[in-house]
UniProtKB/Swiss-Prot annotation:
Residue stretches in coiled coil: none
Annotated SUPFAM superfamilies: YbaB-like
Primary site of residence: cytoplasm
InterPro entries: YbaB-like_sf, YbaB/EbfC
Protein family per UniProt: Belongs to the YbaB/EbfC family.
Name of this protein: Nucleoid-associated protein Anae109_3761
UniProt subcellular location: Cytoplasm, Nucleoid
GO molecular function, one term: DNA binding
GO cellular component terms, semicolon-separated: bacterial nucleoid; cytosol
Upper classification of the organism: Bacteria, Pseudomonadati, Myxococcota, Myxococcia, Myxococcales
Keywords from the named record: Cytoplasm, DNA-binding
C-alpha cells in the first residue's frame, strides 16, 4: 500500500469537503406551515435567510398560533436543509459517511 497515494487522496477529500461546505451557503430550501401562512427560506448551513408571514396569520388575540406556525415552518426548513446538506456532502465525499461533516 502506497502511503503517499493515501496522503494525496486524503488531501483531495479534505479539499472537496471544504469546497462543499462553502457551497452549503448557496443551497436554498423553503418550508411552510399553516397552509402557506408562514414560509421560511433557509440555506444549507441552517441559517434562516427569509421569513414571510401572511397578514392573515397575525391575530393579536392568538399570538400562540403564530408562534406555533413559525416554529413548525422553521423546524420543517431545518429538516429540509439538513437533508440537502447531507446529500451535497455525500456527493462531495463520494458517498463516504464521515460523522459530523454535514449539516
Amino acid at each position: 500500500m502506497d502511503i503517499q497515494y493515501l496522503m494525496r487522496q486524503a488531501k483531495k477529500l479534505e479539499k472537496a469537503m471544504a469546497d462543499a461546505k462553502e457551497q452549503l451557503a448557496e443551497l436554498s430550501v423553503e418550508a411552510e406551515s399553516g397552509g402557506g401562512l408562514v414560509k421560511v427560506t433557509m440555506n444549507g448551513k441552517c441559517e434562516v435567510t427569509r421569513l414571510l408571514v401572511d397578514p392573515k396569520a397575525v391575530d393579536p388575540a392568538d399570538k400562540a398560533m403564530l408562534e406555533d406556525l413559525v416554529t413548525a415552518a422553521v423546524n420543517a426548513a431545518v429538516e429540509k436543509a439538513r437533508a440537502a446538506a447531507d446529500e451535497h456532502m455525500a456527493r462531495a465525499t463520494g458517498g463516504i459517511k464521515i460523522p459530523g461533516v454535514a449539516g
